[in-house]
Design a protein with these regions (language model features):
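Bacterial N-terminal signal peptides
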Residues: 11-23
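His/Asp/Glu-enriched, well-ordered alpha-helical/loop segment
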Residues: 99-100, 224, 265, 274-277, ...
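Histidine/acidic residue-rich metal-binding segments in metalloenzymes
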Residues: 175, 179-250, 255-271, 290-303, ...
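Extracellular/periplasmic ectodomains of large secreted or surface enzymes and adhesion receptors
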Residues: 30, 308-317, 321, 394-451
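Bacterial N-terminal signal peptides that target proteins for export
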Residues: 1-14
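C-terminal cap of metal-dependent C-N hydrolases
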Residues: 38-41, 369-413
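Histidine-rich, glycine-flanked metal-binding segment
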Residues: 40, 44-84
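Divalent-metal coordination cores built from histidine and acidic residues
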Residues: 30, 77-203, 303, 439, ...
Length: 451
């Protein structure tokens, strides 16, 4: 066969192979991953004991017991561990600069990203500062801490409209109301125009006032509004706005929400709260006030949807202690709500699926379900135990954090665990291997005198 003919046949064979590859569902896909043997807290469908999760192309494909695992699969043995969806941080502070788009300012190599993974957080609401004098503004997004992977970091943008109308700045509130009324009037005129246009095609559309796009999104309920309010009076003022303009509202803070829980529930307003936030009661009024450890439980009883965040909700939660053993992480604040009477299931939902619902990303994250993103964490114990570490964190099916390989946390262990390659802890030394006097001292006995 001559050279030109050989090249032609080689081209034909290559094209056929390419067509077969495109037609095959397996071609170009990642190898299947199986997380096997753990107790799976699905959040929405109970707990699967000694279960297996099959992951392919970043998605959960199957969940159950005794699943057939392909021989070439990447098997992660997590026997004796707790497996649950990655945590969802429904609010953060100082996570993004004041840019028009969060996507333009993301840094996948930021130290905070690795700390989020170590804390088991796989979805994070971030916000930038709005322009001074604007009652609505500031970029918002939901991101994933995909360390080193910029392409898969952004989950949703925009995610909400920030309301900058603090109770002590009456002008901001007045400006917000005026803009909302302008937007409401424009929508009324637009509806009238659409009806009349069928009879008169030459009719001119109403002129849209400037700077009302954000307000239109609120009135059309395309985007929720987020407003910081802690005291009962602040919360009630926010609810008055919902009465006049029926937009979707999320209250951040809600320290005294327990005192007006029924009013919040009646307007279908969500709350993002910190169970351990402290606020002294107002001694100048006769009504209940101040913080209450039963805040979350009271809101649950009233039918209010809420998410839980730490009192200091920085991008990576906080590093006041060690991630995974830090008393300021999401599970510890959820545990504080349980101590106030909230049931464990609702507390888990408040840091996973309910938080995802409030952020509008529950179709992808927040629970372990077939078809959802494989954002999964593996814990060394019960999520609400103070001594539990995050051991593995998967984002989009990829292992993003392994505690045993972490430069920050590999050496940190429970008191009864040995550290590979490290000298034994002083509490793990066999007393019989110690000199007699040292053994007696540790046993609380009086050492034998030396003659």
């Amino acid at each position: 066969m001559t050279g030109p003919r050989l090249r032609i046949w080689a081209t034909i064979v290559s094209l056929i192979a390419l067509m077969l590859c495109v037609a095959s569902p397996l071609c170009g896909q990642e190898k299947l991953t199986a997380i096997k043997g753990g107790d799976i807290y699905t959040i929405t469908s109970g707990i699967v004991i000694n279960g297996t999760i099959l992951i392919k192309d970043g998605k959960i494909v199957r969940i159950g017991q005794g699943l057939d695992i392909p021989k070439d699969a990447n098997v992660v043995d997590v026997r004796g561990k707790v497996v649950m969806p990655g945590l969802v941080a429904a609010a953060t502070m100082g996570a993004a600069p004041s840019t028009d788009k969060i996507a333009d300012s993301l840094d996948p190599f930021n130290y905070s990203v690795s700390m989020a993974l170590a804390s088991g957080v796989t979805s994070i609401f971030v916000t930038g500062r709005g322009s001074p004098g604007e009652s609505v503004g500031g970029a918002t997004a939901v991101i994933k801490p995909t360390y080193g992977d910029m392409d898969n970091m952004l989950l949703k943008e925009p995610a909400a409209e920030n309301l900058n109308i603090a109770s002590y700045r009456w002008m901001d509130r007045t400006n917000f109301i005026l803009k909302m009324r302008q937007a409401k009037e424009y929508l009324r005129k637009l509806a009238d125009y659409e009806k009349a246009k069928a009879k008169n095609e030459k009719l001119e559309a109403p002129r849209k006032p400037g700077d009302i796009d954000s307000y239109l999104r609120l009135l059309r309920r395309e985007m929720p509004a987020r407003l910081s309010a802690d005291k009962a009076g602040e919360i009630m003022k926010a609810l008055e706005l919902v009465d006049e303009f029926p937009f979707r509202l999320v209250i951040e803070g809600g320290t005294e929400a327990w005192t007006v829980a029924d009013a919040i529930a009646a307007r279908d307003v969500a709350v993002i709260l910190s169970p351990r936030e402290k606020q002294r009661p107002n001694e100048d009024i006769s009504q209940p006030s101040g913080s209450n450890v039963e805040n979350a439980a009271i809101l649950k009883k009233a039918g209010v949807k809420f998410a839980i965040i730490p009192a200091v909700s920085h991008f990576y939660m906080t590093m006041g202690g060690f991630a995974g053993r830090d008393l300021m992480t999401l599970p510890m604040d959820a545990a504080a709500a349980v101590s106030g009477g909230l049931d464990e299931q609702t507390a888990l939902e408040a840091i996973t699926i309910t938080a995802a619902q409030i952020l509008g990303v529950d179709d992808r994250v927040g629970s372990i379900q077939e078809g959802k993103d494989a954002d999964i964490i593996v814990l060394g114990g019960h999520p609400f135990h103070y001594d539990t570490f995050v051991e593995l964190t998967f984002v989009n099916g990829k292992l993003m954090y392994d505690k045993n390989k972490s430069v920050y946390f590999a050496h940190i262990r429970r008191y009864d665990e040995k550290v590979p390659g490290m000298p034994p802890d002083i509490r793990q030394i066999d007393p019989n291997a110690l000199p007699p006097r040292e053994s007696q001292r540790r046993a609380g006995q009086r050492p034998t005198p030396i003659h």
